[in-house]
Regions:
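Short, small-residue-enriched loops and turns at beta-alpha junctions
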Residues: 59-61, 88, 136, 165-166
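Conserved beta-sheet core of the metallophosphoesterase superfamily
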Residues: 89-153, 157
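Active-site donor-binding loop signature of nucleotide-sugar glycosyltransferases
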Residues: 74, 84, 130-132, 149, ...
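Structural signal for conserved beta-strand scaffold positions within catalytic alpha/beta enzyme cores
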Residues: 6, 52, 81, 129, ...
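Short, solvent-exposed aromatic-acidic interface loops
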Residues: 157-169
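Active-site glycine-centered loops adjacent to acidic/histidine catalytic or metal-binding residues
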Residues: 9, 33, 55, 83, ...
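N-terminal active-site segment of His-dependent metallophosphoesterases
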Residues: 1-50, 58-68, 74-76, 81, ...
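Short active-site segment of divalent metal-dependent hydrolases/proteases
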Residues: 12, 36, 86, 114, ...
Length: 172
């Protein structure tokens, strides 16, 4: 059994709560738009395995260090991890053929800043977009996802909302 922490779209923003929520995870997956290599370094200090892909805002250093897509198997579950993927019925160009060829049980992407955990009946997989963990973007709630994989199946998914403390701005 493995616990996997999933995040995306940090856009160089680090929140110490990533470490708090992911401290008991066996792996952490970052679905791109990392922003700063230090984010990956900090995640590597939390979990023994970190898998990450670069996103459309990531610069040359991250593009040299990471790939745009990772395909791997963990605890019997085949996974495709990428940044721009779309969602069931509306996949980005090239993704449908990749899913056809790879036949994963789990497809993880980011980019939209929209949290989605939905089954894709056409490809017989679970689609997860963890939403955005960073502050850049239009999302109103920052999110992380933790899943449990056991004996070749995703057993559960937990959504974590990272509520920001209210600011004490003076009223005018």
């Amino acid at each position: 059994m493995k616990r996997i922490g999933i995040l995306s779209d940090t856009h160089s923003y680090w929140d110490d709560r990533y470490a708090k929520y992911f401290e008991h995870c066996d792996e952490i997956w970052h679905a791109g738009d990392i922003g700063d290599e230090a984010i990956i370094d900090r995640l590597e200090a939390i979990a023994p395995v970190v898998r990450a892909v670069y996103g459309n805002i990531d610069g040359a250093n991250l593009r040299r260090r990471l790939r745009p897509m990772e395909i791997f198997t963990t605890d019997g579950v085949k996974v495709v991890l990428t940044h721009i993927g779309g969602y069931p019925g509306h996949y980005a160009p090239g993704i449908r053929s990749r899913l056809d060829i790879s036949m994963p049980q789990l497809f993880v992407d980011g980019h939209s800043h929209i949290l989605k955990i939905i089954p894709d009946r056409e490809f017989n997989l679970l689609h997860i977009n963890p939403g955005a963990a960073g502050k850049q973007g239009w999302q109103t709630v920052r999110t992380l996802v933790i899943i449990t994989i056991d004996a070749g199946a995703v057993k559960d998914a937990e959504v974590i909302e990272l509520a920001d403390p209210p600011t004490n701005k003076p009223r005018r």
